[in-house]
Structure formats: C-alpha cells, structure tokens
C-alpha cells in the first residue's frame, strides 16, 4: 500500500512543462563555462550571496522533504512508486542518487561529484531544485532593476546571472507538486489534491493573488502553512454567542470564517481541525459538551471518502446547538480550536506500525516510529475563547 500521494501533474505553460519535466536532467552542460565555485550547487554555496533565503529555507518543510516520514516507506513501495515520490520530494537526479539505486548511473554520479564536491548531506528540495537547469539559473523579475539594467549587469554577475521567468511568481509554478494530475485518482468526484483548482475558482485568483503572495511574502523562503499557528490564525475569524432560551437551555452559535485563505481550509486530506466546546467549573475543570470536525476524512487506503467539511474561501463553518446547564457545576463555556496538521499520516502510520511493524527492518521501523512521534507532536491549539454562562433572569 502506497501511503504517499502521486502528485506529478501536467502543465500548460511551455516553460513550466520543460522545467518540471520529470525525471529532470543532470546539470551537465558543456556549453556553459563556470568556475568550480560557481558550478557548486550545494545550498551552503548559494548562501554566500543569498544568506537570508538560505536561512529561511533551512527551517522550511522543503528542506525536510526527505525525512523519516518518507524514508521508511522505501521498504514497502515498489521502485516505480518510490521514484515517483522523489520527483517532488527530491527533484534533482543528483539528490535522488543518494536514496534511489535507479539514479545511480554513471552520468548522474559524475554530475553529482562535479556539482556537489563535498557530497550531499540533505537530499531534500534544494535551491537548484527550483532555480537551476543545465547550469542555467532562473528566477523572478528583479524588484530593483529594469530589464535593460539587469541585462547590462548580467555579464558581471556570478554564474552568468540568471534568466528572468515570471512564472516564479505564478501559482502555476507550485502546481506541479501541489496538485494531483488530471488523470489522478478521484474520491467523490475530487482529486486527492486540488489546491490549485480550489484557488483558481476564487476571488483571490481573479484579483491576481498568487500562492507566493501568502506563502512567500516578500519572497520569504520558509513557505509557511498549516503547521504554523500564527500563519493560520491570520486567515481565520472565530466568533460566537451564548443565549439562554425560554426553557432555560443554553443556545450556542459559533462561526469560524475563512477571511484570508485562498483555498479550502484545511486543504488536502491530511490535516483536521477540531472545534470543541467545554463547560468549565469554578476550579477550572472542563467537560466536553460538543465537537465539530473540519477536514476531508479518507480511509488509509485512499479508496473511500467519509466526509468533507472544509471551508471554502470567504465562507464559514457554523456550529449551533443547545444543552441543559448544570448551573452549580458550570460557570464558563470554552470554545477551543485545535489543529492536527498530520492527522491522516498519523492514522496511516499507526496502522502500518500495527500491521507491518514486525515485517520491517529495524532501521525502517525506527524511522516509522520517529516520524509518527514527530507528527503527533505537530498538534497545536489555534484559538481558545471563553464566555461566562448567561445569567438566568428572574421570572
């Protein structure tokens, strides 16, 4: 059973079609003359001029795309499945050669020795994964120089400067690894990943707001997302009210509105968001009264969708219910919103450990256990709101 998602898609743009034509070619290009320093593609080398981007990348999930969570799966996937995962998790053939025998050809190993002379300590998504093809550097338009000024300076820039591609500021650039292919598996009429399509049909797209505007503000290379509490909070607005009904019950009306998210929240089938309502006594002890779950719940075999309660951009998830109050016990009501960024992975990994644990090698089992622990630790409380119990008016 493959736990990873196959996410190589087709693209309309000719540059992007070539740029993300997997498997990528090696960096060998005899027509380009570079010094040894310039041809060294280690991210640490890029940091000599791009220190801020390097430091941001180090803390990003792109820099952790080859970790325990994917490495343990190599033992249970076919060669074809494993290599398909690497198209996005480790795009360069030189980095793939570190973790896949398929890419340990003479040509690729020769390119790896030349362009990574100190070796590859981290075969994840690197600077060159997005910015370099055949020893030609690509990037977005300069924010400080005109096209003519940049052309004049190119000859004096390291690695012959770079070719400007506006696609680096387009959502389509991200589509390759964040959208299922058109021919990909569907559940209940929806692909496993549709974040680009979700965005494409929104006011965000109509206004020209791209993925990069939110996930790479000021060209920041941390690519914040569902795992970052502050980032998520900025896109949501919770509101609620308590009223006492004529028969003495408490009516709760709660609304979580998507105010700054350009796709469904949460996107993909991996995260879940729990809206929980508690009654709290004078000692601070809480009792769960009601729970509502946001997300797309799919079985671990990726063959059946149970529900999809995600919020579309600009809309809300509403929860309304009544309950009978024990006035002596409950003084305050709490609304807590908890995010589990890796819920589907946790469920899948727990099942794999339970059913396959004894069949895995010791190293692979340890990788699975470590990844499972890491993903369980990713949960966080997004909001906690409290309201006093409405007073009972005298009759």
Predicted stretch roles:
Residues 1-6:
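Bacterial N-terminal signal peptides
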Residues 200-207, 212-213, 217-395:
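Short, conserved sequence motifs used for protein processing/export or organelle targeting and
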Residues 167-170, 223-225:
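Outer-membrane beta-barrel translocator/pore domains, especially the C-terminal barrels
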Residues 131, 178, 215, 219:
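Short Cys/His-centered divalent metal-binding micro-motifs
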Residues 10-168, 176, 182-204:
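Sequence context of c-type cytochrome heme-c attachment sites
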